[in-house]
């Protein structure tokens, strides 16, 4: 069977250095993690690190060959949490979905997972079509929402979508809070389309 690799994915892997030098050479990981004005790292980044450790997931900050995408969904007023992982490795896409319940401690800013369900997922349209659409919406390159010029988020509650991108030489983390409220910005509109695509496919 002939394997067709999307051109967009090939370009991402080349740009990110995923097909780089010998495995004997340790690659320095370029990290992009948003911070607040005082230099403190994003709270959602801290919370995701906590959940990542509890779920015993690989730390993408250490690099991943070839590409892994994680979309963490955080609901502010309920204890539900969700995670979609899409992984491209050895010329093959795979997906996993996690449903979680978590206790939030506002005193020490921690989350403790109390319940977890995990299942393998496959898109209805197939991995080639789904991954092409996902990459065309620039999921690997979207900026952090707070960095979008002219966008002011005055909402205090609501769902936040946190994205981790891991390649052999790059790690990115970015967040979108209620992107459907800011669709006049193409970046937020793309995030809305990404979420719509995932809902339709899974």
Model-found features: residue ranges?
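Bacterial Sec-dependent N-terminal signal peptides
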Residues: 1-29
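Function-determining sites in protein domains
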Residues: 19-202
């Amino acid at each position: 069977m002939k394997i067709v690799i999307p051109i967009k994915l090939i370009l991402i892997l080349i740009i990110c250095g995923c097909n780089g030098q010998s495995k004997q050479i340790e690659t320095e990981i370029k990290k992009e993690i948003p911070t607040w004005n005082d230099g403190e790292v994003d709270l959602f980044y801290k919370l995701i690190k906590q959940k990542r450790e509890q779920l015993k997931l690989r730390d993408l900050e250490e690099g991943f060959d070839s590409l892994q995408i994680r979309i963490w969904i955080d609901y502010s007023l309920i204890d539900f949490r969700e995670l979609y992982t899409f992984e491209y490795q050895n010329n093959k896409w795979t997906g996993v979905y996690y449903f979680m319940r978590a206790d939030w401690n506002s005193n020490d800013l921690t989350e403790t997972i109390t319940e977890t369900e995990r299942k393998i997922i496959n898109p209805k349209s197939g991995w080639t079509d789904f991954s092409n659409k996902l990459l065309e919406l620039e999921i690997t390159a979207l900026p952090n929402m707070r960095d979008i010029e002219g966008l002011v988020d005055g909402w205090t509650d609501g769902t936040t979508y946190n994205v981790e991108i891991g390649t052999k030489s790059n790690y990115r983390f970015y967040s979108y809070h209620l992107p459907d409220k800011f669709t006049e910005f193409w970046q937020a509109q793309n995030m809305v389309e990404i979420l719509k695509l995932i809902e339709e496919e899974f």
